[in-house]
Curated annotation (Swiss-Prot):
Keywords: Disulfide bond, FAD, Flavoprotein, Membrane, NAD, Oxidoreductase, Redox-active center
Signal peptide as annotated in the record: none
Cellular-component GO terms for this entry: membrane
Active site residues per record: H437
Residues annotated to bind FAD: E33, A34, A35, E36, V37, G38, G39, V40, C41, K50, A112, D306, A314
One Gene Ontology biological process: 2-oxoglutarate metabolic process
pH dependence text: Optimum pH is 6.5.
Protein name: Dihydrolipoyl dehydrogenase
Cysteines engaged in disulfide bonds, as pairs: C41-C46
EC number(s) on file: 1.8.1.4
Source organism of this protein record: Thermus scotoductus (strain ATCC 700910 / SA-01)
Length: 461
């Protein structure tokens, strides 16, 4: 039996950084991968989706460029688009494999299953280690009455735009995945209807900024319906007849589409891992139970990323992987749960920390500052004046509690807010920081000043 200091099961955005960090700290590391290096995010998630979003955004901007004197009628070659998307993925997966090799991490292809607390089996061979990190990720959640297939897509199938753009598309799910893919297909020519069971899209996010995103999407032409569920569908000659119903029951309506995209969430991928043989416990939803050190119920076994707990985000998985690897090497690392979220629509949405509602429930005396992008010179020059930046703070201590953005490049802007929260900054700290002009980042400074009714470029009310 070959033995190692650390075995990492899965090489996604949590697994490969964990393996590299373990090797950096002097551990003998084996990384086991059942599919493709880079995991869901790199191969069939974050990266290919963002590539398609960029292409769709370019098409959208060209169609609207006449306003500043550019007349263009873009013609899209879907096969070339698919090849470009795959090229981006291939370059990055090759880079990850090179990083593993360069850090002397041994890579083994195959499916790993636990044989006991300190042993796994891969391809019929047994491997042992002092520590294990489970980083097996997640898979699309199915929806009753909508089995995945030719007519009902999951998020992975939806990436294959080169196979054709449906004339009419129903997207079930108003979270990040549904919104991003829905807008991609809308901008590439589909008539898109998006439904969400909850009263608003992005139900876990800030309500005000989520409502502004919905308004922007509807203005662009997407049909967004909340408080709605899909009951079932029937395939007929003229398309897929889908029965929709109010979320709380009652009124029903039938719509006809050509394809259905189910994006109602993801579930942890643990089937066949033999967790019970290792003594690893899962919760009622199937997520592996972990503490702040990423330790499971089994000594020496860690779990990270989507398989461990929400939110299911690549950057969260990466940080958790580093924490787990450092603890496997004898350090005392803890996971700080200041995790930003981004939706890469146009306009983008991003948030970190507590929403207004969450802060009030937590007992804070909440104050809010807002700065609209319509007052931002840089936003206007980019043609993206929709949306705002919202700062949530505690009136008594001035402690920064949360920041939410809907507007251009929100995903880039939220990084500064995340750093501020991680450092325990006050709202005044953001306002006192000199920001370059003209930039979108000035809006964060102005929103912080607006909380104290001292913003310069809007009237303080």
């Amino acid at each position: 039996m070959k033995t190692y200091d650390l075995i990492v099961i899965g090489t996604g955005p949590g697994g490969y950084p964990a393996a590299i960090r373990g090797a950096q700290l002097g551990l003998k590391v084996l990384a086991v991968e059942a599919a493709e290096v880079g995991g869901v995010c790199l191969n069939v998630g974050c990266i290919p989706t963002k590539a398609l979003l960029h292409a769709a955004e370019t098409v959208h901007h060209l169609k609207g460029a006449e306003g500043f004197g550019l007349k263009a009628k873009p013609e899209l070659d879907l096969k070339k688009l698919g090849a470009w998307r795959d090229g981006v993925v291939k370059k990055l997966t090759g880079g990850v494999a090179g990083l593993l090799k360069g850090n002397k991490v041994e890579l083994l292809r195959g499916f790993a299953r636990f044989k006991g607390p300190r042993e796994i089996e891969v391809n019929g061979e047994t491997y042992g280690a002092q520590s294990f990190i489970i980083a097996t990720g997640s898979e699309p959640m199915p929806l009753k009455g909508f089995p995945f297939g030719e007519d009902v897509w999951d998020s992975t199938r939806a990436l294959r735009v080169e196979e054709g753009i449906p004339k009419r598309l129903l997207v079930i799910g108003g979270g990040a995945v549904g919104l991003e893919l829905g807008q991609i297909y809308h901008r590439l020519g589909s008539e898109v209807t998006l439904i969400e069971y909850m009263p608003e899209i992005l139900p876990a996010g800030d309500r005000e900024t989520a409502a502004l995103l919905r308004k922007a999407l509807e203005k662009e032409g997407l049909k967004v319906r909340t408080g709605t569920k899909a009951v079932g569908y029937e395939k007929k000659q003229d398309g897929l007849h889908v029965l929709l119903e109010a979320a709380q029951g009652g009124s029903q309506e039938e719509i006809v589409v050509d394809k259905i995209l189910v994006a109602v969430g993801r579930r942890p991928r643990t089937e066949g891992l033999g967790l019970e043989k290792a003594g690893v416990k899962v919760d009622e939803r199937g997520f592996i139970q972990v503490n702040a050190r990423m330790e499971t119920s089994a000594p020496g076994v860690y779990a990270i990323g989507d398989v461990a707990r929400p939110p299911l985000l690549a950057h969260k998985a990466m940080k958790e992987g580093l924490v787990a690897a450092e603890n496997a090497a004898g350090k005392n690392a803890l996971f700080d749960f200041q995790v930003p979220s981004v939706v890469y629509t146009g306009p983008e949405w991003a948030g970190v920390g507590l929403t207004e509602e969450e802060a009030r429930k937590a007992g804070y005396n909440v104050k809010v500052g807002k700065f609209p992008f319509s007052a931002s010179g840089r936003a206007l020059t980019l043609g993206g004046a929709e949306g705002l930046i919202k700062v949530v703070g505690d009136a008594e201590t001035d402690l920064l509690l949360g920041v939410f953005v809907v507007g251009p490049q929100a995903g880039e802007l939220i990084a500064e807010a995340t750093l501020a929260l991680e450092m325990g900054a006050t709202v005044s700290d953001l306002g006192l920081t000199i920001h370059p002009h003209p930039t979108l980042s000035e809006g964060l400074m102005e929103a912080a000043e607006a909380l104290h009714k001292q913003a310069i470029h809007i009237l303080n009310r």
